Amino acid sequence: MSEIGSYHDTIFALSSGRLPSGVAVIRISGPKTRFVYETICQAIPEPRHAALLTFRSRNGDAIDRGLTLFFPAPHSFTGEDCAEFHLHGGKAVVEKMLAVLGELPGCRIAEAGEFTRRAFANGKMDLTIAEGLADLIAAETEGQRRLAMQVASGNQRKLYSEWRQRLINARAFIEAELDFADESDVPGSVSMQVWQQLSALKHEIEHHIASGKRAAMLRDGLHVVIVGAPNAGKSSLLNFLAGRDVAIISEEAGTTRDLLEVKLDLGGIPVYVTDTAGLRETDSVVEKIGIERARARMAEADLVLSLEDMSGPVSVTVEKIEAETWLIGTKADLGGSASGLWKYHISTMTGSGLEQLLDALQAFAEAKIGQIEDAVPTRQRHINLLRATIEEIEKAIEGDDLPLELRAENMRLASQFLGRITGDVDVEEILDVMFSQFCIGK
């Protein structure tokens, strides 16, 4: 972001959705907010009370009439003077208002995430809360919304701040033993208690990291891959799950050459289901590429649905992969073997077994995710910094042959790594990347 640290400019942006709409909200933040009111409304409304005013250009022409709210610093989202203008959501109305604001001295259009970045810089939120807001905006399922709301509510911040304070307190005891070993008010050899406390903290962080895998699945989705021989009914199953015709269905074998993916919302959990090229020996170069991609996607899957036509001879062969694999018998309406090999029997012609399979997929997803009620790491940078924290704690605990000064330094570094998660310590290099992921107006 350009000159983002000075905050001398007053920024504005459309914060509501795509135009046209019933109502459009333009947000403003910065030192010229009161000047904007005096110029456009000829009045400054009472703080935090909606006022119905006419919005005018600098030459007095009426742009629109609508509600506006004024939030004086520091009691605002950004910590600066802020305002919201609620206009009718017509394209011409909004474009005119934005053009008028852009002509005012000291005012400019906001960059992506700039409102939230100013809130962070002014101490209105930490990095984890900002990330939670980004995830809340991006949430597409109920599970993703709940997870994002936990983070945006400050649960992570409270946990990491508590851990950091425990490290700081432990380090203070060690340094007190170093500096005041001869003083009567310093307990004799407190270091053993400190190492025990750090060991307990290390186990807490390790358990916390383990829960991050489930959070990542909820945030990024589970991946289910449909495989099988050509004409086993893979595309028909994908179309049923999607609720629409996504894949071409034909009597001709090998019509699916590339990966086809649909996203499902199963009980609030995002699940990506991929149809793949039929697995067989072929001379077709294009089909071979499709089969290679199918095998690569299988290797990344959380669950593989291996389909076989029940109306033909039983010849189930399952490729060796790490993911859980379900054997699904298809075309059950045509009869055939009732072999106990199949986990489910389905028919996309009659609908037999399809709802049971869908219920089973949801149960699988829910079992994988589990109940996420406590604060969990939701991003890879959290996990990386938590692992670095553990590494420094281990050095401090296991450094029996090291001077206490060095072990205290390990504790200082551990607390710094925790501070980087919340943004309390040395995070300037990640700010541009993080806030650029927000939309304009947030």
Swiss-Prot record:
Instruction: List, for all copies, the residue spans of the domain called TrmE-type G.
Output: 221-366
Q: SUPFAM superfamilies from the xrefs?
A: P-loop containing nucleoside triphosphate hydrolases, TrmE connector domain
Gene Ontology CC, one term? cytoplasm
Q: Which residues bind Mg(2+)?
A: S235, T256
Question: Tell me, what is an example of a GO biological process annotation in this record?
Answer: tRNA methylation
Name any one Pfam family assigned in the record.
MnmE_helical
Q: Which cofactor does it need?
A: K(+)
Top-level division of the source organism's lineage: Bacteria
For binding (6S)-5-formyl-5,6,7,8-tetrahydrofolate, which residues are annotated in this chain's numbering? R27, E84, K124, K442
Establish whether keyword Cytoplasm is in the entry: yes
One molecular function GO term is: GTP binding
EC number(s) recorded for this UniProt protein: 3.6.-.-
The cofactor note reads: Binds 1 potassium ion per subunit.
Q: Where found?
A: Cytoplasm
Q: Which InterPro entries match?
A: G_TrmE, GTP-bd, GTP-bd_TrmE_N, GTPase_MnmE, MnmE_dom2, MnmE_helical, P-loop_NTPase, Small_GTP-bd
Q: Does the keyword Phosphoprotein apply?
A: no
The family database entries (PROSITE patterns) matched by this protein are listed as:
G_TRME
Family, as annotated: Belongs to the TRAFAC class TrmE-Era-EngA-EngB-Septin-like GTPase superfamily. TrmE GTPase family.
> What is this protein for, i.e. what is its function?
Exhibits a very high intrinsic GTPase hydrolysis rate. Involved in the addition of a carboxymethylaminomethyl (cmnm) group at the wobble position (U34) of certain tRNAs, forming tRNA-cmnm(5)s(2)U34.
Q: What is this protein called?
A: tRNA modification GTPase MnmE
Annotated organism of origin: Brucella abortus (strain 2308)
- Upper lineage: Bacteria, Pseudomonadati, Pseudomonadota, Alphaproteobacteria, Hyphomicrobiales
